[in-house]
A protein has these predicted regions:
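Short hydrophobic/aromatic segments of transmembrane alpha-helices and their interfaces
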Residues: 4-5, 123
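Amphipathic/coiled-coil alpha-helical interface segments used
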Residues: 18-21, 29-32, 36-211
Length: 211
């Protein structure tokens, strides 16, 4: 996309959602840098995120800027990230900054060895799970899936709580098992290949023309 088109997109986001133009450009840039997608795809995702209500607390663009690297490091795509945030938010957590923070805390604990004892307590093969997580991409996602399954199926409430906090930090206390499980679900309708931005552009342009 040309610079003119990118700027036009950012202005349309300002008109429709009240997003600051510079912040929109920065968020789109974060997405292209971290996930290797095009500017057009980045704007498609931002539009769909806003349409899903992810900016209820005015923290969508900040969350993209701050946490894209964390989702990428955990093996997720840009599409995954937006669907995860939408799924987490649907459980009633509209402060999506907290959802991003949960992924960040999890990454740190998986990387620095803090997670090991909790993975063991959940009955997982720690070495295997960590090695799989460190491969990134689908391998990492599969490892995370195993961890979430073990957490959800844990009948011992005390152990579940300890392991949850051990893996996700204080975000586990803030969010709870259902929200974290939803957050770790990548299924959803948000796609970078949609034409959400083009549709918004034409609608915003029509409005400007007629006003």
């Amino acid at each position: 996309a040309s610079l003119a088109q990118i700027t036009k997109n950012a202005i349309a986001l300002e008109d429709v959602f009240g997003f600051d133009v510079v912040e929109s450009l920065r968020a789109a840039n974060s997405l292209t840098d971290q996930f290797g997608i095009s500017a057009e795809e980045a704007f498609n995702l931002i539009v769909q995120g806003a349409q899903k209500g992810l900016n209820q607390n005015d923290d969508l663009l900040d969350t993209i800027n701050e946490y894209s690297v964390q989702f990428r490091n955990a093996g997720y795509s840009a599409d995954d990230m937006f669907n995860m945030l939408a799924n987490g938010a649907e459980t009633g957590t509209w402060s999506i900054d907290k959802l991003g923070d949960a992924v960040k805390e999890f990454n740190i604990r998986m990387s620095d060895g803090t997670a090991n004892e909790y993975l063991e307590q959940l009955g997982l093969n720690t070495e295997e799970v960590i090695a799989q997580f460190n491969k990134g991409g689908p391998e990492a996602q599969a490892a995370i899936g195993d961890i979430m399954e073990a957490l959800q199926e844990c009948d011992d409430a005390t152990l579940q709580y300890q392991a949850g906090v051990g893996l996700f930090g204080t975000m586990w206390e803030d969010l709870g098992v259902d929200t974290v499980a939803s957050l770790m679900d990548t299924q959803g309708a948000i796609q970078s290949t949609s034409d959400a931005m083009a549709q918004l552009d034409s609608a915003a342009y029509d409005t400007l023309e007629s006003s």
